[in-house]
């Protein structure tokens, strides 16, 4: 996330393109306003149809006397598509399918996913064939190939999550899952652009333009699917016609019986499946060796105990490595240490000392370190794209880009995080609770920005939330200007609440991605009930998208319960958490 070379900033927007976009946006707002009545009618009719169907099924085989709701498939599709950012591509891509002659909103959503999957599946063949002429560009293209595969998995998972029961609407839990996975799929595609865009070569600039053009359809189609699930299925799920009945007590519905028993047994870290020790007193001397035992796509928890020591190795748990728990003897005793960095030729995405994609990852009492140093610029200690991942009593030590909360739902509790520029960044739905966040002295003439949030689509359910934490200097030599963060993308979302902010903070609080360029009005940056000498908001930035205070009701939207659905899965990770304010 280099200040100058990064492609990611909103400041890179062409002025003419921005004017055209604003004109298009105004036109779309008018269209949406007009079509809202139609859309509401479609939704009411869809729910009415479901209710009629259910009542009819429960009464008698004959339904001749029950009035049926008649809808125009074309009108339904148009109303649905008018809620998306790209209504034209939504309508044209779905209406071309034979199955589109329907008014079922869930089927229309699945068709939108189908066109997104078809488009993304063909994308790898469109990647630049001569990338091998530039070694760094080839590494960036490799990142693209990896994240496209992840995005496809998210799209397929979204189809599976809604089930196959006809005439019923998805449950709110299913909708939340799908919103998360589609948000991640969009983030994956954006990560490709980031990897190529951070390079500063002629070949990279040409490749970036080529890839952006080739990705336009896949990005729009995925965005359309996300808008439909957020604005249509999300509303329908509030009616009492769920496709899967949600459990209100006990373990969350996504856990199987075997997984529940294992979690009950292993919550106390008493029965590890593997023990790692540098001195040879365990089964393995390296973490990597122990992780080779993990079965792919296993619903069973696999736990690894890592004894005190510094383990110099890079770990990458792929998307098919599920439900791994790794724990040590303490965040200041057991460390995983690496030194990969951007300056030596590694894409930021691949610099992580420890990277995890597979769902259900848990880390406890362990530290993650990237010791490349400030002069090496981007150097990630930990990157997580693991859905429902938990980090409890962990430490993350680095300089620029220390902690990459890339995508999906994540929770950090009682953790220590040090760094300089953008040292908590990414586009996950992530909550940091009761953590110690410690900016450190950067290179001369540099500044510190704690966060850089990467939300690029308004319907993504993502953001960085820091709650009940402390923000204090690391060491006693911090003199560099220090800020709570800077907006990385057009819809960046960051909330600092109920935290203690030290005197280290510059009174303006936040800074723009591009100096002297105000962020888009579409960002959401807010503070709520903070304390300490740095919590005074009287001199804060005056951006349209910044809120120096928000209501209790607004703040509730960013709690563990509302933002990451924590009560459904955190109790089984044996981690403390506050679900509300």
From Swiss-Prot:
Q: Which superkingdom is the protein from?
A: Eukaryota
Pathway the protein contributes to: Glycan metabolism; pectin degradation; 2-dehydro-3-deoxy-D-gluconate from pectin: step 1/5
Q: Name one GO biological process term.
A: pectin catabolic process
Q: Where is the signal peptide?
A: 1-55
A Gene Ontology cellular component where this protein is annotated is: extracellular region
**Catalysed transformations (reactions):** [(1->4)-alpha-D-galacturonosyl methyl ester](n) + n H2O = [(1->4)-alpha-D-galacturonosyl](n) + n methanol + n H(+)
Any single GO molecular-function term of the entry would be:
pectinesterase activity
Q: Which UniProt keyword terms apply here?
A: Aspartyl esterase, Cell wall, Cell wall biogenesis/degradation, Disulfide bond, Glycoprotein, Hydrolase, Secreted, Signal
The task this protein performs is described as:
May have roles in the deposition of pectin in developing tissues and in the wall loosening and cell separation that occurs in cell expansion, fruit ripening and abscission.
Q: Which family does it belong to?
A: In the N-terminal section; belongs to the PMEI family.
Any extra remark in the record?
Answer: The PMEI region may act as an autoinhibitory domain and prevent untimely PME activity during transport.
Q: Which NCBIfam families match?
A: PME_inhib
Descriptive protein name: Pectinesterase 3
Give the organism, scientific name: Phaseolus vulgaris (Kidney bean)
Q: Gene behind this chain?
A: MPE3
